[in-house]
Amino acid sequence: MAPLATSTVTSTTITQGPAPPTHHAHPAFPAHATLSPTHWEVWVFDAVSQDPASNAALEISFFRDATGLFRGRAPLRIAFHAQLPGGGDDGAGPPEAVHFDEVADESVVEDRGDAIVSTWRSARDPARTTTFEYAADLSGAVLTFDLPEVRGTVTYTNAGGGSSAVDGFAAFAPKIAYAQPMVAAGVEAALTFADGRALRFAGKGGGDRCAMQAPMPLLLDENTYVRGHAGPYTFALLRSVSRLDRGRECVRASLARDGEVVFVAAASDVSLADDHVVVRAAHGGNVRGTFADTSSGWRLDFVSPAKGKHWHFDVQHQVVWWSIPLGPPPAKLGNNGFTSRVSGGEVGGEKHEGMAVVGHLQMPQMPATKK
């Protein structure tokens, strides 16, 4: 049966000007119909083992993004970050990271009715592919890798089950739309790398979506992404400081208990009436990023005055997972990833422990386009 809708883009076909919208309601389907030097979008999947001694983790981002063409950045790419536990012959060493960018020549996304299926064909060999498939009701997702660097699957099972009523994108910040298709999921990872190493773990994770109408350096001063787990709780948080809106803090947070979303907020101002989330940097820990930011974690408060509920979680960085400079010296601006310890729960109730995936970046100013 033919797909209900198809979005195909190639790395050499770029719209000169704003990308037209697809007008598709499902958050896993592309928001933009074409590649454009001004519009871009990303699908993000993460997972982390809940064994604090392991630090096994994944973060995979699928980019349709031509905003970096002027500086030689491939418009179709998959950013792959893996962290393998226990390096060394005895397995007791520090975790080992695997990072690479897979460049694609073509990205095809199909709405097949019961699933949104995306295939990314390698620029090196079109027979080599990476795919992701979301169930239409968001009950699960599967990532499949058939690349020289890595082969295998990562399977997500939505802890909240599926739903016939699927929320789409919502405005997050000026020129930025955001969605959290899968807040809390169980994850099974089974990957084998070219050198024979393997990453196999059962953990927790989820999936996010973001679509922007300008290059990120024009929109944001900094950006923080956290998906944390502690006992029955999972929280997904995106926090950005807007460059267009004079430093306004923009935030979107969801909190789930046993898979059921019990709290959603898009406000960071403390209120006696409205749901809000308070995000504060933590300092004094043993692990912090490699750039200007000196925080060693985050302190998160999810507050619902109307329900009389307050949840608090401490996120303490455990391992610096990746470190990507985003500007030349002397400015110490860049993108850090962490696996982090989580502790917390409902204030006055039982305290739970777990692990999180954290990304934090500070953006340089947009460089001038070469003439």
Label for each model-derived stretch:
Residues M1-K371:
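Structured soluble/peripheral alpha/beta segments that form catalytic or ligand/cofactor-binding pockets
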